[in-house]
Every structure is written in C-alpha cells, then in structure tokens.
Swiss-Prot record:
The gene is hemH. Fe cation binds at residues 215, 296. GO terms for molecular function: ferrochelatase activity; metal ion binding. Its main location: cytoplasm. Pathway: Porphyrin-containing compound metabolism; protoheme biosynthesis; protoheme from protoporphyrin-IX: step 1/1. It comes from Bradyrhizobium diazoefficiens (strain JCM 10833 / BCRC 13528 / IAM 13628 / NBRC 14792 / USDA 110). This is Ferrochelatase. Coiled coil: none annotated.
Length: 345
C-alpha cells in the first residue's frame, strides 16, 4: 500500500549545507510568445481561475472556449507585439520582473543565506518552478512577495492559492510568509510621488491634471467584500496629500474592464473622452497599482487612452512609467522584504 501523501510530487533535491531563506517575487503573468497560440495558452490559464472569473459554470466554459479563445488571442497578440521586447523575445513585464529580482538579490548579497527568485502567477516561470528552485537551494523558509500594492482576491489571494497548492504536494514543506498589501506604505507613496515629480520635470508641457488609473474589477466583487476599491482610494488620497493637490488635480479612475458586467467607476477611457470634451488639453497618467510596466500600461494607457484623449480634442498626453526596477521602486521592494524577513535574518 502506498504511503505517499495525496497528489504528492517528487521532493526537490536539496543542496547540503546551511539552511537558507528564500524570497519569491510574484507578478501576474505574460504569454511566452506574442502570437495567437501563445496568448491563447495564457488567456486560458488566466480566465480559468475562479479568483478572476468567479462563475466558472458551464455557460462561462462555453463562452470561454467557444468564443473568447477563438477570437481574442488574435487581437491581443497584436497588442503584445506593439510592446514586445524583441531583443529578449519576451514581454516587458518579464524583463522588468527579472531585473527586480536581480537587483533585490544584489541588495541582499551581504546576507549569503538569502536566495531571491521570481515567478508569474500565470505563464512562465511558474510559481511551482520558483518554489522548487528555492527548495533546491536549501531554503527551508520562503517569503512570497505578491507585487500588488492593493489587495484583491483576484491578484494577491490567487498567488497565495497557488503557493499553497504547490506546498500541498510536498511532504517536507518550507515555512511560509507572505508580504501584506502596501497600498499606503510610506515608502511606496514616497516612491510614487518622486516618480511623478521626476517625470513631470522632464516634460515640455505642464499637465493640467493627473489621472491615477488602477486596474478595474467587477463591482460585484467589491459588493461581496473585496477591499480593492478601498485600497485604491487610500493610495490616491495618500498620494494627494504627499503631492499637495486636491481631488480635482489627481483623479482616480479604473481601466481594463472586460465583459458586460458593471465594473468599478469612473472608467479611465470614458474619463479621457470626457476631460478632452470639457476642454482639458494637457494631462499625465500614473498607474499606481502596477509594480512594473506591462500591456495595461504600455499599450492600453500610453497608446490606446492617449489616442482617445487626442481624438476628442486633447493635445498633450504623457504616461508616467511604473516604479519598475528604478531606485525608488527597488527601495519599496527592499523595504517590504526586509520588514517581513525580521526574525529570519
């Protein structure tokens, strides 16, 4: 009779020597290739997650497999091709997240028992591969770092779900910690403010206002108790205080809505149209909910929403880069990680 644990996988081979502490940076994910087949694989994994689309019933499966995965990969592949890192043949999100991991490892290099790696919730490198690699390096403690400032079940929680699924298949599990959301952390707000001020100083025009655009979500998710909207509001209010502006000069909007349900409002694209029609001619957009530039910032904001604004009468538009692997951005990640590693290092 087998004595293996249910669904147990082979335990990663562990190097001998001092036990180490692992740090795993995790972002959302990206297709492996900027073509329809690659996008289809990515979208199927992403949209099959019940944390993302809560109703995974028969109707949704028919819609997903019979409609969405037949048409959407072609159009989204064209969007990815606009921003693709052709030199490395990967998305900017993958390039930046790798660099964040490398820079964090360098910052912690004086602690030789700390190992840093990175993973994506959907696509590659997977969370499983990241955890396996850390265990193979001798890590008996792992800090998972979801790179989402504002908590949502559809982002932070699904990272935890996947980490737990991976650990559930191991007989010898490492001790686990997860960094909390950091939507009003002082280091995060300061880094955002510095990035905005630095970027605005490089522009040949002065924006009449700034739009803070966050990824949207169905309103029903918030109605059921998701704190995401509350966190986005808190971030925006903290940023207004730090910049010394009021709500008329730093607007809060939500982007990337999908499907026919009502999502959190005001919508970013509709706001771009309205502002231009009301006579606003110069704006800048910051995306505080994204730790790294990706399709939603580089294509949807910097290209699509810029076009909407200018088509309706706007003249000058600037997308402020995410914190990425900049010095202020790395200060945020390093601060979060060192805080949560207390007692381990």
């Amino acid at each position: 009779m087998s004595t293996a644990a249910p669904n147990e996988t082979t335990q990663p081979t562990v190097q001998s020597g001092q036990k180490r502490v692992g740090v795993l940076l995790v972002n959302l994910g990206t297709p492996d290739t900027a073509d329809a087949p690659g996008v289809r694989v990515y979208l199927k994994e992403f949209l099959s997650d019940a944390r993302v689309i809560e109703d995974q019933g028969l109707v949704w499966k028919v819609v997903l497999n019979g409609i969405i995965l037949r048409s959407r990969p072609r159009t989204k592949a064209l969007d990815y091709q606009k921003i693709w890192n052709n030199e490395k043949n990967e998305s900017p999100l993958k390039t930046i997240t790798r660099s964040q991991s490398d820079k964090l490892a360098a910052a912690l290099s004086d602690r030789d028992h700390v190992v840093v790696d990175w993973a994506m919730r959907y696509g590659n490198p997977s969370i499983k591969s990241g955890i396996d690699a850390l265990i193979a390096e001798g890590c008996d403690r792992i800090l998972a770092v979801p790179l989402y400032p504002q908590y949502s079940a559809s982002t932070s929680a699904t990272v935890c779900d996947e980490v737990f699924r991976v650990l559930a298949r191991l007989r010898a599990q490492p001790t686990l910690r997860v960094t909390p959301p950091y939507y009003e952390d002082e280091a995060y707000i300061e880094a955002l403010a510095v990035s905005i001020e630095t970027h605005l100083a490089t522009l040949p025009f002065k924006p009449e206002l700034i739009v803070a655009s966050f990824h949207g979500m169905p309103k029903s998710y918030v109605d059921k108790g998701d704190p995401y909207q509350e966190h986005c509001i808190a971030t925006t209010e903290a940023l207004r205080r730090r910049l010394g502006v009021d709500a008329s000069k730093l607007l809060l909007t939500f982007q990337s809505r999908f499907g026919n349900d009502e999502w959190l409002q005001p919508y970013t694209d509709k706001t771009m149209e309205r502002l231009a029609k009301e006579g606003v001619r110069r704006i800048a957009v910051v995306t505080p909910g994204f730790a790294a530039d990706c399709l939603e910032t580089l294509e949807e904001i910097a290209q699509e929403n810029a076009e909407i604004f200018k088509h309706n009468g706007g003249e000058q538009f600037s997308a402020i880069p995410c914190l990425n692997d900049s010095e202020p951005g790395m200060d945020v990640i390093r601060t979060l990680v060192l805080r949560e590693l207390q007692g381990w290092i």
